[in-house]
Regions:
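A mobile, often basic/glycine-rich helix-loop segment
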Residues: 73-92
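Class I (Rossmann-like) S-adenosyl-L-methionine-dependent methyltransferase catalytic domain
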Residues: 3, 37, 68, 121-125
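Conserved substrate/cofactor phosphate-moiety recognition/catalytic segment
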Residues: 9-12, 16-61, 71-75
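Small-molecule kinase domains that catalyze NTP-dependent phosphoryl transfer to phosphate-bearing small molecules
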Residues: 91-95, 103, 110, 114, ...
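Hydrophobic anchor at the beta1->P-loop junction of P-loop NTPases
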Residues: 6
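Glycine-rich, phosphate-binding/catalytic loops in enzymes
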Residues: 22-23, 80-83, 123-126
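Residue-level preference for the first positions of well-ordered beta-strands
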Residues: 3, 61-64
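Conserved phosphate-donor/acceptor-positioning beta-strand/loop module used by diverse small-molecule
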Residues: 66-68, 87-91, 99-120
Length: 161
């Protein structure tokens, strides 16, 4: 099974990329993670294992996570005071689990803060309420990209929109 994790700040173009990938292959299962998933299953390892097992049972050739463990790490720290934040050690565990199911590819979708802010305002984003907050999120993703390139067990790509 191919596992593709698509990460990036609000307004970067993640969901647009995921929709394009889904159009290329009908044998794709996609899971868009939101803060409600974190609240429902606070344990990040269990949260992702449940979806990997489901994809495996469905015999999907590819599973796409629209957001994932890097978003958990960033947004939980910046927006929610770290209550359910994911640690670097937990990221390593989740990625090892992913590798036990198949190939892992991590794609960071990036854009300028100005472009992302315009998209967030256009669609009425509820979590990102200011450009300053988006700047913090963008800076955290830049650090996450560095971390992933150094330690991820999968292939890591950055796609600029």
């Amino acid at each position: 099974m191919n596992i593709i994790l698509v990460e990036g700040m609000d307004g970067a173009g993640k969901t647009t990329l995921v929709e394009k990938l889904k159009a290329l292959n009908t044998d794709i299962l996609c899971k868009h993670f939101t803060h409600k998933d974190v609240e429902a299953t606070p344990d990040p390892i269990l949260r992702y294992v449940q979806h990997l097992e489901y994809a495996s049972e469905q015999q999907a050739s590819t599973v796409i996570f629209d957001r994932g463990w890097y978003s958990d790490m960033i947004y939980e720290n910046i927006l929610r005071g770290g209550w359910h934040a994911v640690s670097a050690e937990q990221i390593s565990i989740v990625e090892r689990l992913c590798k036990s199911y198949g190939d892992l590819t991590v794609v960071f979708v990036t854009t300028s803060v100005n472009s992302a802010w315009a998209r967030c305002k256009q669609r009425g984003e509820d979590l990102i309420t200011s450009k300053d907050l988006l700047k913090k999120v963008s800076a955290a993703y830049n650090e996450a990209i560095k971390l992933a390139k150094l330690s991820s067990l999968g292939m890591v790509y950055e796609v600029k929109t």
